[in-house]
Amino acid sequence: MAFLRVPLKRLAVLAALSGLVLPGTARADELGLRGTITPEIRVFPQDPSGAKQTNSDLSVSAEVTAKYFFGAGGNQSIVVTPFGRLDQRDHNRTHWDLREARYGLVAGAWEMRIGFDKVFWGVTEAVHLVDVINQADLIEDPIKQEVRLGQPMVRLRTTQSFGTFDFFLLPYFRERTYPSINGRPATDIPVASDLATYESSRKARHVDAAMRYSNAFGDIDLGLSYFQGTGRDPILQPALDASGSLVLAPFYAQIKQGSFDVQATKGAWLFKAEGYWRDELNQQYETATGGIEYTFYGIAGNEGDLGVVAEYALDSRGMVARAPYQNDGFLALRWTANDAASTSLLAGIVVDASTGARGFRFKGERRLDEDYHLSVEAYAFGDVPKSDPVYSVADDDYLQIRLARYF
């Protein structure tokens, strides 16, 4: 329950800034409230590598979002989204987080947000390389890493005729979450987050900054970004914990990163790419991914659409532990039923051209009625050699089923 370690003084400042603009009373039509309660089961068909790990896990999560709009024409807002999970076996996965807790103000072509917020950058399917603002909540989404922790920030946006500019000031760093020795999927050597170290002497209090330009040029959407501060993906270094056991200690380096993401739509074709250049620990390197997606509309005379996705990812560093997508191809089929239940299926395979390792991914979801949503995900690995960066989790194939109740 200790993943939200933001200094109380900083929280107090954010709360005070929000409180200054709160009116004394609120009308019901200005307040929106929604949430979910989601039981989950994970099943691991392979025997665990750790003595304290098991082949199944039960948990339940809850998330509530409250949105309050006020001011002239609703130009001011308060948004709060707390999230929490209770896990049967992994005490690290029993946690809570503020996904959002922000005040927003819109004034003409300008918008300001202050507080905890989430920002997404990226266009590709297999991996999002340029999504650098928010830290990955690894215990929630260990493979795709698309679930993110709330990030304290001051965000300023302006939309002009020649594009949109975003400016970010990030006053506090969020460490990546990791499973305990009871959790799966997990590395063979457990990660000890309490032994985390930083290149910056200010540690988590280092102030990061970022900026982004985005615009649409006809059928082409373009984003150009720059980030400078504490890197979100740590280097895991061997260390000994207090009992003398071997663990992995996260080290967070300072980085400078310039990135791009671009997507073009031409009829049934979708072309997309993203990548970055990074300066880290006196080393400069590049990584990029891109591909195509073609959609067959109205398959077999039905309302459903079938998309074929093909992508490739390359990292100039070659095979290193932090670059699972360093010379990898991705192929997937995406089926969308276009029905009232929003039924969709995705099945894909990743192949490492350097090692021959394979990863399989499946996701299916649909609404059961107005209040329930079912999702099924499965991940599996095959022919993974010890030299491959994903070897330590290759024995953690799993099936995950979630049934969300909306209110």
Model-derived features: where do they sit?
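Residue-level signature of outer-membrane beta-barrel architecture
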Residues: 29-31, 66-70, 104-107, 116, ...
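Repeated loop/turn-to-beta-strand initiation elements of outer-membrane beta-barrel proteins
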Residues: 31, 72-78, 109-112, 162-165, ...
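Membrane-embedded beta-strand positions of outer-membrane beta-barrel proteins
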Residues: 35-37, 78-82, 114, 156, ...
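Transmembrane beta-strand segments that form the barrel wall of outer-membrane beta-barrel proteins
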Residues: 37-47, 77-88, 99, 270-279, ...
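Residues that define the transmembrane beta-barrel architecture of outer-membrane proteins
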Residues: 54-62, 94-99, 108, 148-152, ...
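Outer membrane beta-barrel
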Residues: 73-185, 218, 383
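Outer-membrane beta-barrel "beta-signal"
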Residues: 156, 292, 393-407
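Detector for outer-membrane/organellar transmembrane beta-barrel domains
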Residues: 268-352
